[in-house]
Amino acid sequence: MKRVIVSVINDLVTDQRVNKSCITLQKLGYEVLLVGRKQRKSPPMDQRSYDTKRMKLLFEKGPFFYAEYNIRLFFFLLFHKANLLLSNDLDTALPNYFISKLKCIKMIYDSHEYFTETPELVDRPRVQRVWKRIEGFVVPRLPEMITVCESIAELFHEKYGVKCHVVRNIPARAALPPKGNKKALNLPEDKHLLVLQGSGINIQRGAEELVEAMQYLDDCFLMVIGGGDVLPILKQMVADLHIEDRVHFMPRMPYANMMAYTQLAELGFILDKDTNLNYRFCLPNKLFDFIQAGVPIVASRLVEVGKIIEKYQIGLFIPDHDPKSIAATIKEGLSDTSRRAVWQQGLAKAAEELCWENEQQVLLDIYKHYE
């Protein structure tokens, strides 16, 4: 049986894009092995239909972490048989590329974001140069690659001449759990529920301003679900503003559990700031999660996110990132019943069209090139 090794640098638990890629490869008859890492605070792995391997590392962040993971991944790939390699993001690309050449194995590269233009790198030019060199070495040598949206695909094509396919981060309709109720999930029944979710609740994504806006919204309750480097700051802000009764933090959780909470929200948030190319052109999972959950969206005016919101009429935009402006936009989104009716119609149409059952055909066609 033909075998594919799929690699990613996270702990596998909540990466829905990689999970869908693995399941799609299984449909083409591949035996799948997914490789990632296990952190000290990683949740246990859920049951999968394919094999997984999480490597325990000595380092959990910084240059030694990236170096250790890449070296460990290189030797893992070297000593494990595969007919195909799927590399997810730039931080796994180098060992996959070297092994593909060394063992004459085909490699697929899937870039989940515009890695070299993330704020974590833009603010550290020396580190950014290292990753740009890796990108500049690997990507031009690939016949084709995959990424998450048209804008990023165009950037890669213009810069490196590589053929770039677009597969969006869209959930399956079948993955949505039955809608529950506030009481069963211990949520306040007398408040408007709001949700900010994701595994990348990081700097420059508007989370701080959203939390600050909650001091002006005494009839609202914000659920912050997931992980990210800005969470300690958010928790301190909540304590300093004395709004513990309005903001509740929940850890990363399995997708079905997260969506059970998301479905009960009246508004979901995508407030990334247009401070770097990665955020400007982002098309995050949560956009499509909100669509499938039937939750109208409050967003900043980002290129790809804005296209979807305007096309389907499924939400509204903040004028700026001032907390009072955000609070005013939230109040508008909750109180305008006629617009909410329009949004619900748009969400129903978008959910029918923007689902994995449709999007997976694009990925199947790409993978068939490598059979």
Model-predicted segments: where are they?
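Donor nucleotide-sugar binding/catalytic pocket of nucleotide-sugar-dependent glycosyltransferases
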Residues: 36, 53, 132-178, 249
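Acidic donor-binding loop of glycosyltransferase active sites
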Residues: 143, 246, 262-281, 295
